[in-house]
Design a protein with these regions (language model features):
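Hydrophobic positions on the alpha1 helix immediately C-terminal to the Walker A/P-loop
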Residues: 48
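Conserved lysine of the Walker
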Residues: 45
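Glycine-rich, often acidic-flanked micro-motifs
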Residues: 16-18, 22-39, 51-52, 63-266
Length: 266
């Protein structure tokens, strides 16, 4: 909350976002291919930024300055419901000694987590340090740092099936969508939410904002214009293009891979 206040005064953009970068040189941030993921709980920020093929900068809060982006948190807070190693290998392997499980049912003498058990709540979570992710920027001179974003991804979980799976936004449309923050509250993300509910959360982080959303929107437009940063909208929810079912994670991962390669190949 303090960073949302202070960084804005310093003309730095504090964001509710995750970030990763390519496996390029640690010693030259100018060679980085950095992706920022914006989105509310349940839209896929943690899952998609924890990519075995890329380096995780941070999970939830970043600041975009005149020199690039930096992470302001030292760990991750991942949803665990129906967690499977085949779908989310890095997060699955991070659930080990030293991590903290929340609302997760454990069984047997070895306290084995039962990730499919939602008898307490669907909002099962795990907190773990960044160092538990093998490909994370958690140590060294450039720990938690990245260059200017090469691409930004707005993650929205559209429960109405109105949005396409992927689209490229103009700068003006990007700012408008950023200010609107259209998404859905997912089951288990808040007390009493048992099915997807359409909602709007300004800047994809309304609970954390201190200033009027337009301050953050103005800073975002300034930065994406200055650095020619493309902004993509990715729907991780439901789509009529997919037969009215939720878009599978494997499809979304391929979209993110396309976005990263699209920018690199331009």
């Amino acid at each position: 909350t303090w960073m949302m206040y202070q960084m804005t005064i310093e003309n730095k953009l504090c964001l509710h976002s995750s970030a990763n970068r390519n496996k390029g040189s640690y010693l030259d941030l100018s060679t980085d291919n950095v992706t920022l993921f914006f989105g509310m709980s349940g839209t896929g920020k943690t899952t998609l930024s924890s990519d075995p093929e890329r380096i995780l900068i941070g999970d939830d809060e970043h600041v975009w300055t005149d020199r690039g982006v930096f992470n302001i948190e030292g760990g991750c807070y991942a949803k665990c419901i129906d967690l499977k190693e085949c779908h989310e290998p890095d997060i699955f392997r991070a659930v080990r000694y030293g991590s903290v499980l929340e609302n997760v049912v454990v069984k047997g003498l070895e306290n084995t987590p039962e990730f499919s058990d939602d008898s307490i709540t669907k909002n099962t979570r795990c907190s773990y340090p960044l160092s538990y992710i093998p490909n994370s920027a958690c140590s060294g001179e450039f720990a938690g740092l990245g260059g200017h974003p090469n691409q930004i991804v707005f993650l929205t979980c559209d429960a109405q099936g109105l949005l396409p799976p992927i689209s490229l936004l103009s700068p003006n449309d990007a700012v408008d969508f950023f200010l609107a923050g259209y998404t859905s509250k997912m089951a288990g993300t808040e007390m009493g939410v048992t099915e997807p509910v359409t909602t709007f959360s300004a800047c994809f982080g309304e609970p954390f904002l201190i200033w009027h959303p337009e301050k953050y929107g103005s800073l975002l437009k300034e930065k994406i214009t200055r650095h020619n940063t493309p902004v993509w909208l990715v729907n991780t929810g439901w789509s009529k293009w997919n037969g009215g079912v939720r878009i599978p994670l494997r499809y979304t991962r391929q979209m993110i891979k396309f976005i990263n390669n699209y920018t690199s190949d331009k």
